[in-house]
């Protein structure tokens, strides 16, 4: 998935695992292509000493493409930064298992790096609003709780996946099932069917609202729920 028109992206390296290099991708509007009003509002905030910024984290089987969110915040004079987490969207490399992770706390590397970039570009006085969707909401609050990151002063969660759907009994009964599947290896595919409602409701070709850059995957790379990933969610 390439960079969107009018945007810039940067890739950071996070190390490697058994599937190769691990990277994350940061995306933002190109400051030189912002509308004049947005640039003026940025300057006004800076002169008043009110430096604000937004960090955006996507959800499962997702990446950043929602231009309207960036354009809304930028129209107010507030810089907007998004991240494609490791093995999602622009950060997925050949041979990698899409979205796979065994410990959600590992995403702290991406979050810390993006926070540091925001502070470096916007100054030490910047106050950051963290906006996160679905699984990104869960990963984000784990980061906030464990690290108490500086400069992040507020959080807004969109449909956060903070707990499993269903009641407590569902978790009690399903936990041994997840553990049993993990005996076959963390990347064992879980027998969970995705009806595809989410994909259809966002894609303009199937009645949704957005015309976005698709990230085609061959069958071995499809976004199947894996036992190791599910265990990370349960933990």
PLM region descriptions:
Residues 1-47:
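N-terminal cap/lid segment of alpha/beta-hydrolase-fold proteins
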Residues 29-86, 92-94:
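Short, surface-exposed "cap/lid" segments of acyl-processing enzymes
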Residues 60-61, 66, 89-126:
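Catalytic nucleophile-loop/oxyanion-hole region of alpha/beta-hydrolase
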Residues 71, 75, 120, 145-146:
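Short, well-ordered alpha-helices that flank and scaffold nucleotide-derived cofactor binding pockets
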């Amino acid at each position: 998935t390439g960079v969107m028109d009018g945007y810039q992206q940067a890739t950071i390296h996070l190390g490697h695992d058994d599937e190769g290099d691990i990277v994350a991708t940061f995306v933002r509007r190109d400051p030189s292509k912002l509308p004049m009003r947005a640039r003026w509002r940025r300057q006004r905030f800076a002169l008043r000493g009110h430096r604000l910024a937004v960090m955006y984290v996507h959800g499962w089987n997702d990446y950043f493409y929602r231009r309207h969110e960036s354009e809304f915040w930028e129209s107010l004079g507030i810089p907007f930064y998004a991240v494609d987490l490791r093995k999602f969207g622009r950060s997925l490399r050949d041979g990698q298992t899409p979205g796979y992770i065994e410990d959600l706390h590992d995403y702290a590397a991406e979050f810390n790096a993006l926070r540091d970039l925001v502070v470096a570009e916007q100054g030490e006085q910047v106050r950051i609003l963290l906006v996160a969707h679905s699984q990104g909401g869960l990963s984000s609050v784990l980061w906030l709780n464990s690290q108490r990151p500086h400069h992040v002063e507020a959080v807004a969660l969109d449909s956060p996946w903070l707990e499993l759907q269903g009641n407590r009994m569902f978790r009690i009964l399903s936990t041994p099932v997840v553990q049993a599947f993990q005996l076959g290896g963390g990347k064992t595919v879980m027998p969970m069917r995705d009806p595809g409602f989410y994909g259809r409701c966002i894609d303009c070709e199937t009645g949704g609202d957005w015309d976005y850059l698709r990230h085609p995957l061959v069958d071995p790379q499809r976004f199947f729920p894996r036992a190791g990933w599910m265990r990370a969610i349960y933990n």
